[in-house]
Amino acid sequence: MNRLARQAEISPDQLRSSQVTMLYGESGEVEFIDYGVKFWLDVTKVMFSSGNITERHRIGNIDMTGECVVDAFAGIGYYTLPMLVRSKAKHVYACELNPNSIEALKRGAQLNEVTNRLTILEGDNQETLRNLTGIADRVHLGILPSSEQTWALAVSCLKSTGGVVHLHMNVREVE
């Protein structure tokens, strides 16, 4: 065993900062392969969402050949990389605020040899999405508990012919 860490709840701050404590070993750097897609991250700097594995797989199974896609909450590339590697998106515009997540996304893109089909827009997506008006066939809003604050901007990113918006949110079960 080289490393051991304890992951606490994801921080509620805007960057969704890591709450990992290294118990053994020093480096929090991790490289892994998920359904043929290579990811890299430093678990001490960015959060890792193990709970979205089913959705990552589902998104990777959608044929996006020839499509321009916007990922409004890119993180380390949870959905961006499967869209490029498995779904064969022509190009993905990935919006991300956290510099540590951006570094992980860049490393993942290099590992998967898709950097030429990826544009990363660093900053608050309330601003960066405004630069993507009318370019997308598909917009992905993969954030919990809700992506509602970006719905209008997401729709404005779609081409004039329309497209698909994937949105994530928690909903209450009504009895």
Predicted regions and their residues:
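S-adenosyl-L-methionine
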Residues: 95-138, 146-147
